[in-house]
Amino acid sequence: MTGSSDFPVKGLRGRLTPNAPLGPRAWFRVGGPADWLFVPEDQDDLALFLREKPATMPVTVLGACSNVIIRDGGIAGTVIRLARGFADITVQGNSLIVGAAALDITVAEHAAAAGLAGLEFLAGIPGSIGGAVRMNAGAYGSDINAVFEWADILTAEGELRRLSHDELGFAYRHSELPEGSVVIRASLRGTPDNADAIRSRIADIRASREASQPVRARTGGSTFRNPDGHKAWQLIDEAGCRGLQIGDAQVSEKHCNFLLNLGQASSADLETLGETVREKVLAQSGVDLHWEIKRIGRKSEGEQTV
């Protein structure tokens, strides 16, 4: 283990970093440091940490950091980031057994190579499988709920459990994963099909995303959930928020449900902009938008509660 001897859990083999910068890891490129950043070597290393950590230590799991605003004051306790030891992808029959750190697009490509259809939608979702399972990520007419078979998790106490589809209780952008648990791997089901046809559909999804979303900007994916019977982007546009800017935080002119960091935005700028959009949409349409992007961590000193 690399890191400080002050850390309360001994015997870890992974990388442990005190006061670790998180902003450079986030798609928005904003956010304060983690008190501790732990990158476990493997499942056993992570289980040891979860078993032995003090009960009072806050723990936050971060994946690809594509759907999160890390606040400017950083994150208390320990941030867990799963890396290469959790990114394996194997094909078993018509299923893919996927490590939680595997990127969604990589899973889609592996499924295509195996001639398994139904996972193409993952090519349109920035992030990793652990986060996709946790929030029932979806795009282009499908979601994790439609292809999920089971997930192996480590509980907050470090116990390995396998959860079935029914136990996850999927709903729109939601699952019933136990509090404090960490997804280790998941089994996703495909349907046999022609590999070239699958690759063609993936290419279409990637082209559509490139054309309609600010994929090359500092952004975090869809900001708000789609309310029942509405499209969030349309409500935002009708409220006059396209291009709205606070500091270097801007509502994308290309797709209104994306926030952008134009260069020097803070997390506070992004969060304040999002709340301003919510207020304007509520005043215009009476619809209360709910955040899809997770906002985590401490606000900076003196920052007002949003």
Swiss-Prot record:
Its EC number is 1.3.1.98. Its cofactor is FAD. GO terms for biological process: cell division; cell wall organization; peptidoglycan biosynthetic process; regulation of cell shape. Keywords: Cell cycle, Cell division, Cell shape, Cell wall biogenesis/degradation, Cytoplasm, FAD, Flavoprotein, NADP, Oxidoreductase, Peptidoglycan synthesis. InterPro entries: FAD-bd_PCMH, FAD-bd_PCMH-like_sf, FAD-bd_PCMH_sub1, FAD-bd_PCMH_sub2, MurB, MurB_C, MurB_C_sf, Oxid_FAD_bind_N. Pathway: Cell wall biogenesis; peptidoglycan biosynthesis. GO terms for molecular function: FAD binding; UDP-N-acetylmuramate dehydrogenase activity. One of its GO terms (cellular component) is cytosol. The active site is at R173, S222 (proton donor), E292. Residues 29-193 form the FAD-binding PCMH-type domain. It catalyses: UDP-N-acetyl-alpha-D-muramate + NADP(+) = UDP-N-acetyl-3-O-(1-carboxyvinyl)-alpha-D-glucosamine + NADPH + H(+). Its main location: cytoplasm. It is found in: Cytoplasm. Signal peptide: none annotated. It is an enzyme of class 1 (oxidoreductase). Cell wall formation. Belongs to the MurB family. This is UDP-N-acetylenolpyruvoylglucosamine reductase. The lineage of its organism: Bacteria, Pseudomonadati, Pseudomonadota, Alphaproteobacteria, Acetobacterales.
